[in-house]
Amino acid sequence: MTTTADQLMATARKASLLLTLLAATAFGCAHEGGGAAAPAAPVNATDAVAQAEAGGPLFGQFCAKCHGDAGQGTDQAPPIVGGSALPLDPRPTAKYRKTQFHTAKDVFDFVAAYMPPKGPKPSPDQYLAILAFGLKANGIDLAGKPPLTPDNLSAIVIHP
């Protein structure tokens, strides 16, 4: 049974996510137009939540064009936010993904190798911020955790 407080919290989380995704999309659309990306600025985050916040605009810049403004997926790319995002096994129609996503490290390795498929690539720090943003958007609790690094990603289990 869901309480009114639970419903209010769920609505607040959805509204917060929507505002973050809209801000990220606005940033991304402002930079759409071809050409090389601006030089990669380092992502200086003191914890994983701050890193996720820095990842929002980067999602808009590097991911929203294919995966949709809210990460909902498009005819070009699957959803990366929501109930069908980050499944354990690749979809049968997957163009690039052939591996399972057990941990955040699996996701990072795939994304860093294949995404985006065209155009400029994010820096390693930017990939980590985008990953933190995606994990947080999918309900993975990052509160109190240090910034994501290649060394601590295996500790974040997505599918046991």
PLM features per residue range, with description:
Residues 101-112, 124, 128-132:
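An amphipathic alpha-helix signature
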Residues 4-17:
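Bacterial N-terminal signal peptides that target proteins for export
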Residues 25-28:
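C-terminal motif of bacterial Sec signal peptides marking the signal peptidase cleavage site
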Residues 72-107:
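Gly/Gly-Pro-rich "capping" loops immediately C-terminal to redox-active cysteine motifs
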